[in-house]
Each structure stands twice: as C-alpha cells, then as structure tokens.
Amino acid sequence: GLIGPQLSAQYYETGYNAYRSEDYKAAIENLSKAVIYDETNKDAWLSLGNSYRKSDDAQNAITTYDKIIELFPETETARSAQRYRSQLAENTAQ
C-alpha cells in the first residue's frame, strides 16, 4: 500500500503547482493521476474540480465536485465542493 499514496502526493504537488501557474491542462493531467493513485486525497480532488472549473469545463467540474461530496460527506472539502458546484449550476442555467 504505500506506493499509491506516495505517487499521489507527487502528482498532487506537480498538479497543484501547475494550477497555481494557471496551466490548467497540466494541472488536470497530474491531478487526475493523483486521485487514481489515492482516492482519499481530498486536496487533489478539490484542485482537480477547480482546474476543470477554471478551464471552463463545467461538466467535468460538476462531476468532480459530486464525487467529492459522495466520497467525503460532512467535510470542509465537501462543503467547498458544494459551494463551487452551486455557482456553476447557476452560471450554466443562465
């Protein structure tokens, strides 16, 4: 079991740095791998959802936020996902 979380952490770090540099394509590539290697990596999930949102991919963002809400109920991460998801749903409805 240790290899997955370690790989996840590396992909998360690379992906999060890409996200902060507004390179959302690289962020999505790395963060997608981070959540595959460790499904419990809440930060990677949230950054992935945010990367989709920032690259105007509302559909994937909403899917990712839904997954966070399902995986981590009653957490601050899920509450953040719910807020972003609500904003997107409103924007998409307009």
Q: What do these predicted regions represent?
A:
Residues 13, 47, 80-84:
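Canonical tetratricopeptide repeat
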Residues 6-9, 43, 76-80:
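Start-of-helix register in tetratricopeptide repeats
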Residues 33-36, 70-73:
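Conserved structural position within tetratricopeptide repeats
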